[in-house]
Amino acid sequence: MHNCAYNGGVGCEWDPAKAQANYKKHGVRFADAETALSDEQALTIRDPSSADEERWVTVGLDALGQVLVVVYAWRGETVRLISARKATPREREQYEEQYET
């Protein structure tokens, strides 16, 4: 398990094989994705496409300055990362719109 600053330093975990597959597919490391969860300006919604378990989707800025989309589930007091990718132009625009007030 990896400790992250999300929500006051709760634990983050992921399957190493899933993390490697995610990096090959999306070019995003889970270690970077967990930093997006610490973004105070992140947008988070419940994943409407998940029927099996309650999942969450966060659009946030990672430590490298990339806007990422991170999917995860809560396992007790631990965040279990499921997938992470770079935001589409539309998702990035939605994230940035919150600063235009």
Where are these regions (language model features)?
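Ribonuclease/tRNase effector modules and their secretory precursors
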Residues: M1-T101
